[in-house]
Amino acid sequence: MAPIDPDPPDFGVSGGSGSRFSRFQLPCGSAGPSGVTVPEPEGSAAAHFNPKIILVTGGCGFIGSNFVRHVVENHPGVHVTVLDKLTYAGRRENIAGLPSDRVELVVGDICDAGLLDELVPECDAVVHCAAETHNDSSIADPEPFLHTNVEGTFRLLEAVRKHGVRCRHVSTDEVYGDLALDDPARFTEESPYRPSSPYSSTKASSDMLVRAWTRTYGLRTTISNCSNNYGPYQHVEKFIPRQITNIIDGVRPKLYGDGRNVRGWIHVDDHSSAMWEILTRGRCGETYLIGADGERSNIDVLRAILVAMGKGADDFDRVPDRPGHDRRYAIDASKLRRELGWRPTHTDFSEGLRSTIDWNLTHEPWWRPAKAATEARYAGRGR
């Protein structure tokens, strides 16, 4: 099978010059959807859903591309169409090497209603990963977050409603706000929404749109809210890869504030497997929280990275904290485990961290082009 070329000039591109999108048409199986399932009655156990053609929005981003790889590697009968705008965080290289008879890349904007009208009816389900996700960037310039996260979700829901296609909406635990460091509570599916940043407020808005369209129009949707991800193909602006690549460059890592902020960490492979279980076995209209019980403070994670890379545990610099920096996230994923039997497999955080360090050490050509510009943005914000 021929792989996807990271820079595919020879692919057939539909639309002439001035076309609103570029479609890299790779050989694939059937051209149309493989069938539409009947919505489950509210509250009933879900029948097994077997999609043959999936549209993954944001499929060249971190979470989206890892999910695409998971599908290709574990579900051989499924064809994936990736829709991605290829912003700074979405790159062709993230899906390079995947079989061209299984994966098709369409370059375009999630807010393009006409494009969605072409793509959505061709698939059995949409897995909606497209989002702007970096908190610091949302504080500096919220507008792209409103455009992609809110308007983009609205446009997608309208296409899903028009064409009767199932939607798997991917979201974050940040919509719930934060918990006190000494609070033993964890977020559940019933926790109230209290977003505290421009980013999390746009994701909360997108979740609410999904719920409203589901109730009003009877859409077949599921929502998942996941804890912090780490693993391969994560942009260097994010906490773990930023620290790793700074150490590789001989630069002292930077820690916001007192570093006691707690996050629940999950390997992106485990997130991908949970996303698939919810897509194929989750009950329509339901929300599922995804987490791996990996709560750790930022300072503990940074020290673990430093020690694993042969540095002193305190070989870092403190920088001013981010405005409104949430203190603690913690997820109770018992519903997902109880109803769908899902369990994380990357339960040794030290081992997962080591593999992530090794990946960045061996993939410098992947992250190097974005490093200087990323650090320049951080420096401009005093961080």
Locate the predicted segments by residue:
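N-terminal Rossmann-like NAD(P)+-binding domain of SDR-like oxidoreductases, especially those catalyzing
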Residues: A2-N229, W359-P365, P369, A373-R383
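C-terminal substrate-binding subdomain of Rossmann-fold SDR/epimerase-dehydratase oxidoreductases
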Residues: A31, V38, S44-A47, I54-L55, ...
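Amphipathic alpha-helical recognition patches that constitute DNA-binding helices
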Residues: F62, S197, G231, K238, ...
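Short aromatic-enriched loop/helix-cap "lid" or pocket-rim segments at secondary-structure transitions
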Residues: R92-I95, D117, L179-D183, Q234-E237, ...
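Residues in well-ordered alpha-helical elements
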Residues: G114-D117, D136, E143, F154, ...
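Structural element of the ATP-grasp superfamily
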Residues: L156, V210, Q243, L336-R337
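The catalytic Tyr-centered alpha-helix of NAD(P)H-dependent dehydrogenases
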Residues: P184, P195-T202, P232, V236-I240, ...
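Hydrophobic alpha-helix immediately C-terminal to the catalytic Tyr-X-X-X-Lys motif of short-chain
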Residues: S205, L209, W213, Q243, ...
